UniProtKB/Swiss-Prot annotation:
UniProt keywords, alphabetically: Chaperone, Cytoplasm, GTP-binding, Nickel insertion, Nucleotide-binding
Protein name (database record): Urease accessory protein UreG
Subunit annotation: Homodimer. UreD, UreF and UreG form a complex that acts as a GTP-hydrolysis-dependent molecular chaperone, activating the urease apoprotein by helping to assemble the nickel containing metallocenter of UreC. The UreE protein probably delivers the nickel.
Homology family: Belongs to the SIMIBI class G3E GTPase family. UreG subfamily.
Species annotation: Rhizobium leguminosarum bv. viciae
Main localization, broad class: cytoplasm
Gene from which this protein is expressed: ureG
A molecular function GO annotation: GTPase activity
Keyword Chaperone listed: yes
Amino acid sequence: MKSRNGPLRVGIGGPVGSGKTALTEKLCKAMRDDYSVAVVTNDIYTTEDAEALVRMQALPSDRIVGVETGGCPHTAIREDATINLQAIAGLNQRIPDLDVVFIESGGDNLAATFSPDLADITIYVISVCQGEEIPRKGGPGITRSDLLVINKKDLAPYVGADLEVKDRDATRMRASRPFVFSDMKRGDGVSSIVSFLREQGGL
């Protein structure tokens, strides 16, 4: 069901340890039976995330490409996305029927954003463990991503995080933009994210 405009490109960003790779894995497994899916991962000096997705059997290895960004990973998704665009072009050439390509950024900060030339839809992932105040700190990832995922909700009692406070702050900071609480370890929230991609991405 390939679009005339090419595959839907979904950018997945967030700080180190927030659960980006776990989310990418769950989305691939949830969507691969209905759609033709591929992944591009970004790491500074390795292709570790790509290798992890292969080990997790998220997709066949020929559908997963790891790029080494070197230096600052933010540049490869924003100011100069050439390396990622080339990786997507290579996937399109090898797999002409692609419906969705997930682009997982390297670990970044709250100011990181995806170039509109690279991603059609952006998902930003934060972890409950990173502090109760993270949603209200703002930054483009929090305020402007198409979907905010607040992950590891199951750990809230152990790190002293109040989910009601996070809910209130996310609602205030994002205005009408959607957000989801998730627990990727158990798969909680994945179906809501898939539904969002289907609706907003026209799948």
